[in-house]
A protein has these predicted regions:
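Cell-envelope/extracellular polymer assembly enzymes that use nucleotide-activated donors
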Residues: 1-3, 33
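Short, well-formed alpha-helical segments that are part of the catalytic scaffolds
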Residues: 11-25
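A conserved acidic beta->alpha catalytic loop
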Residues: 21, 29, 38-47, 94
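Short beta-strand/loop segment that forms part of the nucleotide-sugar
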Residues: 31-40, 62-66
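Glycine-rich, basic loop-to-helix element that forms the pyrophosphate-binding segment
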Residues: 66-82
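Short aromatic/hydrophobic "clamp" motif used to bind/position activated sugar donors
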Residues: 87
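Conserved donor NDP-sugar-binding/catalytic core segment of glycosyltransferases
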Residues: 99-133
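Short, flexible, basic/aromatic active-site loop/helix in glycosyltransferases
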Residues: 137-161
Length: 162
């Protein structure tokens, strides 16, 4: 079982598209769950998630609330609620590819000693990439990173974005 943990705070604009992208995954819905941690949302995030759950009864979605504000508290709540052997954090403003869950499952099956994994992070701009954006500022401001398709250790001295 794989658990996708999504921690959210007032992201009604983004949470629906994210959940829709997860619903399009080619991984069996019986083999993953979504734990969505509401970190005191005051917008319509909950309503959007409830509508998604109604529209997709085949997807195991757990909506929980964490009243202690902050990403660390929300992630810890997600871990407590998770039933999966593999935990994948997904940012609440992200979109995932249709093979996203399967690729993680295949990676952990092929590399059982792996303790953490990640993949490319590509920014999605609402219009177009600003002309002033350079590779340096892109990595700094958007968490963009791509170390290629080869399995390897994360570079020492670098930190995952997000």
């Amino acid at each position: 079982m794989i658990t996708l943990i999504i921690c959210t705070y007032n992201r009604e604009k983004y949470i629906g598209p994210l959940l829709d992208s997860i619903a399009k995954n080619d991984y069996p819905t019986t083999d993953y769950e979504i734990v969505l941690v509401d970190n005191n949302c005051t917008d319509n995030t909950r309503g959007i998630c409830e509508m998604f759950a109604t529209d997709h009864p085949e997807i195991n979605l757990h909506y929980v609330v964490e009243t202690e504000q902050g990403l660390s508290a929300a992630r810890n709540k997600g871990i407590k609620e998770a039933k999966g052997d593999i935990i994948i954090y997904v940012d609440d403003d992200a979109l995932v590819d249709s093979d996203y869950i399967r690729i993680y499952a295949e990676h952990f099956a092929a590399h059982p000693d792996t303790m953490a994994a990640g993949g490319p992070i590509e920014p999605l701009y609402e219009t177009q990439e600003p002309a002033w954006m350079s590779p340096y500022t892109k990595a700094l401001l958007t968490a963009w990173m791509n170390y290629g398709d080869t399995v390897r250790e994360y570079p020492q001295g670098r930190y995952p974005g997000g």
